[in-house]
Amino acid sequence: GGDTYTLVSKMKDVGIDSLRDLIIGYALMYYNTPYLWGGRSPYGIDCSGLSQIVYRMAGIDLPRDASQQVTLGQNYSFLEEAMPGDLAFFGDETGAITHVGIIWEQNRIIHASGRVRVDKIDHQGIFNEDLKRYTHNLKVIKRILND
C-alpha cells in the first residue's frame, strides 16, 4: 500500500590504510583493461583516467589529465618514501608530465600502457618486463592521501 520507509544510516569512517587498500583494489579491478586515449571505463582507459576513476571510487576527486593531477598533493623525491595509493608521475626530456601510475608497493606500479598492467618501478622509472626496457622516466611521487 501506501507505506513509506526511511533508512537512516551513518557513513563508516574508513582509516587511511583501508583507503589505500581500497584504491589498490579498485585499480586492480581494471587489470588488463585495454588502453584507450581519453577512456575511463572497463572497455578502455588511459593512465590519468585510471587514477581519476580509482580515486573517485574512493571518494576523492582528481582532475582529468596527468599534467593537472601532478599539481596536487605532497612531493616525495624517493621511491622508498612512497606508500600504496601514492601517484607516480613520469615525463619526457623537456620535463613535461606525460604519464601517471598508482604505486602498489615500493617496487610495483599499476598503470595503463597498452593495457592496465603491473610493472616494476625504481628510481629511474617503469621497467616493462615484456619489453625488457624502461618505458617511462620517473619525475615525482605525490601523496594525495593525508596520513
Where would I find each of the regions flagged by the language model?
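Sec/Tat-exported extracytoplasmic proteins
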Residues: 31-35, 58, 62
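Boundary regions of SH3-family modules and the immediately adjacent low-complexity/disordered segments
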Residues: 1-33
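Short helix-to-loop capping/linker segments positioned immediately adjacent to catalytic or ligand/cofactor-binding
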Residues: 34-42
